[in-house]
């Protein structure tokens, strides 16, 4: 949140933003071969790039080569639009060559395939005939099979705020968030089986790359916050493959 567009963008003036310097202290003492950092996409241009340059200088002064790139989970087999800034520090004495971030795997996936069959949720469910009709128009469109891997917005409910936007699960999910308001807070709203609802905690785990045996908190709000703050497993896996 210190660097997020949806937050106040306090950056290093926010106490959470200064955690990086604690990480730097650990790196200085432990001297790991590789450092992997992740932050919101806006981190790369926060304060006109000064924040990123500060991180780069600190890392390079510790005798590491520094690389960064914005990657989207949607490009790595996960139906969630989640752009994040990934930063890599590689100790020069370990490997002084250029690091190349993984390329998109261009795998067509849909949120629909990551949903749970059994629904046991206290989340409100809505019906909206206009959205049902719009959904059919989209799905019957001759260009439908050529839709890019991204969220497909089909309408709104209530006042139409960010948390009131409704999406079709034939596309990708919007970015899971640890915060936010509105009816679809933290997950967004989706027209599923002709009903409008939020995603379940388990579905949030699914679109974050977590295995089915990953144990969820008994408190749904804890899980929503957890997946709003998490890194997507698939993206990290592809980065680690390139680091081998």
Which residues make up each language-model segment?
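C-terminal target-recognition/interaction regions appended to catalytic cores
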Residues: 134-244
